[in-house]
Amino acid sequence: MRSLQMLLLAALLLGTFLQHARAARATNVGRECCLDYFKGAIPIRKLVSWYKTSVECSRDAIVFLTVQGKLICADPKDKHVKKAIRLVKNPRP
């Protein structure tokens, strides 16, 4: 019974660690990296600003901020993303 408790505790700690690692902050950058790209239509009218992910991130991405405060990770090579970048007037530094 004691070994089962230890196994469950280890699984819980591992799960907590993996969940934290999923946030994927780049080292010494302070910004998050994108793990996947948004696959839907980008709501251009709801976009407020955008920024590029750090060069330290493993995946190049554009991050759009919506009026609701949501972040959308997008592929910078996608033609719809390029159009959205042109239309959004306030890129963040």
Swiss-Prot record:
Q: Name one Pfam family in it.
A: IL8
Q: Where is the protein situated, by its record's location annotation? A: Secreted
Give the record's keywords alphabetically: Chemotaxis, Cytokine, Disulfide bond, Inflammatory response, Secreted, Signal
Q: Where are the transmembrane segments?
A: none
> Which phenotype arises from disrupting this gene?
Knockout mice mount diminished T cell-dependent contact hypersensitivity responses and display a deficiency in rejection of allogeneic organ transplants. In hippocampus, the absolute cell numbers of microglia is significantly reduced compared to wild-type mice. Under homeostatic conditions, microglia possess a smaller cell volume, reduced cell surface area, number of branches and junctions, as well as total tree length compared to those of control mice. This specific morphology of microglia partially resembles that observed in lipopolysaccharide (LPS)-stimulated wild-type animals.
Induction of synthesis: In macrophages, up-regulated by IL4 and by GM-CSF/CSF2 in an IRF4-dependent manner (at protein level). Up-regulated in response to various Toll-like receptors ligands, including lipopolysaccharide (LPS), CpG-oligodeoxynucleotide (CpG), PAM3Cys, poly(I:C) in dendritic cells. Up-regulated by TNF in dendritic cells. In hippocampal neurons, up-regulated by LPS, possibly via a TNF-dependent pathway, but not by CpG nor by poly(I:C).
The entry's note on the tissues where this protein occurs is:
Expressed in primary and secondary lymphoid organs, where it is specifically produced by a subset of dendritic cells. Not expressed in the spleen. Constitutively expressed in thymus, as well as in the lung, skin and intestine. Not expressed in bone marrow-derived macrophages and activated B cells, nor in thymocytes. In the brain, predominantly expressed in a subset of hippocampal CA1 neurons.
GO function terms (MF aspect)? chemokine activity; cytokine activity
CC terms in the record's Gene Ontology section: extracellular space
SUPFAM superfamilies assigned: Interleukin 8-like chemokines (SSF54117)
Q: Does the keyword Nucleotidyltransferase apply?
A: no
Signal peptide: which range, if any?
1-23
Q: Does the keyword Acetylation apply?
A: no
What PROSITE patterns does this protein's entry cite?
SMALL_CYTOKINES_CC
Give all cystine bridges in this chain. 33-57, 34-73
Mention one GO biological process in which this protein takes part, according to its record: signal transduction
Function of the protein = Chemokine, which displays chemotactic activity for T lymphocytes, preferentially Th2 cells, but not monocytes or granulocytes. Therefore plays an important role in a wide range of inflammatory and immunological processes. Acts by binding to CCR4 at T-cell surface. Mediates GM-CSF/CSF2-driven pain and inflammation. In the brain, required to maintain the typical, highly branched morphology of hippocampal microglia under homeostatic conditions.
Please give the PANTHER family that the UniProt record associates with this protein. C-C MOTIF CHEMOKINE 17 (PTHR12015:SF111), SMALL INDUCIBLE CYTOKINE A (PTHR12015)
Family named by the database record: Belongs to the intercrine beta (chemokine CC) family.
Recorded protein name is C-C motif chemokine 17
Organism of provenance: Mus musculus
Source organism phylogeny: Eukaryota, Metazoa, Chordata, Craniata, Vertebrata
